[in-house]
Amino acid sequence: MCHRSPGRSLRPPSPLLLLLPLLLQPPWAAGAASQSDPTGVHCATAYWSPESKKVEIKTVLDKNGDAYGYYNDSIKTTGWGILEIRAGYGSQVLSNEIIMFLAGYLEGYLTALHMYDHFTNLYPQLIKNPSIVKKVQDFMEKQEMWTRQNIKAQKDDPFWRHTGYVVTQLDGLYLGAQKRASEEKIKPMTMFQIQFLNAVGDLLDLIPSLSPTKSSSMMKFKIWEMGHCSALIKVLPGFENIYFAHSSWYTYAAMLRIYKHWDFNIKDKYTLSKRLSFSSYPGFLESLDDFYILSSGLILLQTTNSVYNKTLLKQVVPKTLLAWQRVRVANMMAEGGKEWAQIFSKHNSGTYNNQYMVLDLKKVTINRSLDKGTLYIVEQIPTYVEYSDQTNVLRKGYWASYNIPFHKTIYNWSGYPLLVHKLGLDYSYDLAPRAKIFRRDQGNVTDMASMKYIMRYNNYKEDPYSKGDPCSTICCREDLNGASPSPGGCYDTKVADIFLASQYKAYAISGPTVQDGLPPFNWNRFNETLHRGMPEVFDFNFVTMKPILS
């Protein structure tokens, strides 16, 4: 049953190209009192008045409304919240910009309290030195203004028009969260805080680029701190099925999760994906992980590649599009992997430097063939994006991704050869621990259960390739590091196959792995790390994720 509360109106500025100033108020000043969002299913519908340019929210599920959906706040019981929103399917015809604005507005309204919790948890993980805040704000302000200027100046360009859709959705998110805050009588989040959340992945590279260190010990590097992940695409020997999965690695402070289903009725001949399901977080208009199922037939997975060549980070400038923005635009516009890569390559910010796996299920004929273009691998570093068709590799059985660049140029320019020379083969593409484990064990994947198993695998005490390191394996548990435990590592897994993807369906589990007798993670050992809104103990099962409104 939906929780109901009185709906009120809020008059927003024009949603398209809304020049919202970056508020320079310190993020920690936005009201520290903890708010409790009652668990359960919260429904809401947004109505747009063209005459008054007002949004009205009613806490009902009205399929004739301009945007409608629900938020199932089940984080404490399953590890996941579930958000589903449909926009543009109501009784009145709306512009694409208004549809995107209302979709963002409704999401902000439904998830505002967890958005603030998530910001509170992540901010100290990224901002270690308060002196960097002004530099980050200045960069983001310049980047935002440049982006909005290009959207306004190039309305007939499909790329910039779709960038405008994404920016308009962010404007809606901000104002919807603001409305919810007014109802709850709490201080609203600033636009900077919401931009900060969406740019978390980009900030992993942006902050070091703004505060370069003269020297640092490579031995102090913790692999999970940069948002590293494990991903696997597995094809059965007779092409009977194709499985794909992703396990996220980052600080456990990021374990406030929402799985999202969006269906936006955008009428633009260049929009090839109007509907998507993906793993995400409160306040994020992207996955971050990444794990997307798109209505274009594309699947997008991603793992992060660190850039150890610090001179490359000097090339990061604000007159670019952040990675999260380019991913969203490419997801909306691309029909295939090559086109996705070409769109994503435009205006490369050089931040959140990743390996993207673009799997085109339209190219797969079960029991028969994987056509050319089934799998594109896309990798980014500052000033350069490289992509290639790696379907031939996939035909041999699998593609694994584990935070080491595949393309030789990216590998070399990022500084990995020096890392191998200094620290050993654990940083080589072929002989990293996860490369060896995936190569050894991928043949055991024959069904969904075995795919889940390999992606939660951590037998660090016994596996010779782990050598006793709880992070030299598929699903890292740095909190089990006997010498220096830290609350970070692998904290989820999402798994699907070609048949499930046709229904936008996946299986997802939240929390560090407990497979083969590992103890559940408990925050009582790391209470100094902020974890507002989370369960104290993570010991959940896989949850079936599937949209129910359409």
Curated annotation (Swiss-Prot):
Coiled-coil region:
none
| Disulfide bridges in this chain | 471-476, 475-490
Annotated Gene Ontology cellular component terms: lysosome
> Which Gene Ontology molecular-function terms are recorded?
phospholipase activity
Give any single GO term for biological process. Answer: lipid catabolic process
Q: In terms of one coarse class, where is the protein primarily found?
A: other
Question: Where are the glycosylation sites?
Answer: 72, 309, 367, 412, 527
Keywords assigned by UniProt? Disulfide bond, Glycoprotein, Hydrolase, Lipid degradation, Lipid metabolism, Lysosome, Signal
The EC number(s) attached to this protein equal 3.1.1.-
Positions annotated as pro-peptide in this chain are: 210-228
Q: Where in the cell is it found?
A: Lysosome
Describe its PTM?
The maturation cleavages that produces chains A and B are required to open the putative substrate binding pocket. Both chains A and B remain associated in the mature protein.
Keyword ATP-binding in the entry? The reply is no
Q: Which Pfam families match?
A: Phospholip_B (PF04916)
* Gene3D superfamilies with a match to the protein in the record: 3.60.60.20, Phospholipase B-like, domain 1, Phospholipase B-like, domain 2
Using the record, list the residue span of the signal peptide; answer none if the entry has no such feature.
1-39
Describe its function: Exhibits weak phospholipase activity, acting on various phospholipids, including phosphatidylcholine, phosphatidylinositol, phosphatidylethanolamine and lysophospholipids. However, in view of the small size of the putative binding pocket, it has been proposed that it may act rather as an amidase or a peptidase.
Q: Which family does it belong to?
A: Belongs to the phospholipase B-like family.
How does this polypeptide assemble, per the annotation?
A: May form a homodimer, each monomer is composed of a chain A and a chain B.
Q: What is this protein called?
A: Phospholipase B-like 1
| Species name | Mus musculus (Mouse)
